[in-house]
């Protein structure tokens, strides 16, 4: 079994960039929770079937994919709906992460999990690497990358673990406040 290093950090911290650099330099496998979260709601999956049964057919786009904007409306206006969705998806995502880790053939595996601390998933890794940035850096990067406004980013930040909570869970820290040279 591979030695698992979890990479976590808040939105806009540069987790994916750091993971991609490690992969390029050391040819190691990456298990990415965000990618898995999208895959478990692809058309025909148990996740999407359950979501459609719960929210109704209007939660789907014409092509059968999840209408993410509609789902966001449903869960952010009603906390119990967000909890229902988390209760459905988190076990599916966790199970797939564990499956991919078990199949990893590289000496090290990077487990990229934005909400590692919030979901208490540190047990999945041998070490936790926090990609740390100042809040203003997170806001600027996310506004530029996702074309959202400052208030939307601040709302996301408020729903995530604090910088202090993440740093307390860290075995190692990368300060990523500077522009990465390629």
Curated annotation (Swiss-Prot):
- Tell me the GO BP annotations in alphabetical order: coenzyme A biosynthetic process
Reactions catalysed: 3'-dephospho-CoA + ATP = ADP + CoA + H(+)
Q: Which Pfam families match?
A: CoaE
Note the InterPro entries from the entry: Depp_CoAkinase, P-loop_NTPase
Alphabetized UniProt keyword annotations: ATP-binding, Coenzyme A biosynthesis, Cytoplasm, Kinase, Nucleotide-binding, Transferase
Per UniProt, subcellular location reads as: Cytoplasm
Pathway of this protein?
Answer: Cofactor biosynthesis; coenzyme A biosynthesis; CoA from (R)-pantothenate: step 5/5
Q: Which residues form the DPCK domain?
A: 4-182
- Tell me which CDD domains the record gives: DPCK
Q: Where does ATP bind?
A: 12-17
Kindly list the cysteine pairs connected by disulfide bridges: none
Q: What is its EC number?
A: 2.7.1.24
Q: Which GO terms describe its molecular function?
A: ATP binding; dephospho-CoA kinase activity
Q: What is the predominant subcellular site recorded for this chain? A: cytoplasm
Write down any Gene Ontology CC term: cytoplasm
Task: Report the function annotation for this chain.
Answer: Catalyzes the phosphorylation of the 3'-hydroxyl group of dephosphocoenzyme A to form coenzyme A.
> Which HAMAP family does UniProt cross-reference here?
Dephospho_CoA_kinase
Q: Which family does it belong to?
A: Belongs to the CoaE family.
Recorded protein name is: Dephospho-CoA kinase
């Amino acid at each position: 079994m591979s030695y698992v290093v979890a990479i976590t950090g808040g939105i806009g911290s540069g987790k994916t960039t750091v993971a991609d650099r490690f992969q390029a330099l050391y040819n190691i496998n990456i298990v990415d929770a965000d990618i898995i979260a999208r895959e478990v709601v692809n058309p025909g999956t148990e996740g999407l079937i359950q979501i459609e049964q719960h929210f109704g057919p209007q939660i789907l786009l014409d092509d059968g994919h999840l209408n993410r904007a509609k789902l966001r409306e449903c869960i952010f206006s009603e906390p119990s709906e967000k909890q229902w969705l988390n209760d459905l998806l988190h076990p599916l995502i966790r199970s797939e992460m564990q499956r991919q880790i078990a199949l990893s053939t590289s000496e090290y595996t990077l487990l990229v999990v934005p909400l590692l601390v919030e979901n208490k998933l540190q047990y999945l890794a041998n070490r936790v690497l926090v990609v740390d940035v100042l809040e203003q850096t997170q806001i600027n990067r996310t506004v530029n990358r996702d074309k959202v406004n400052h208030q939307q980013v601040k709302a996301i930040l408020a729903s995530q673990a604090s910088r202090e909570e993440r740093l307390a869970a860290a075995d190692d820290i990368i300060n990523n406040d500077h522009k990465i040279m390629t």
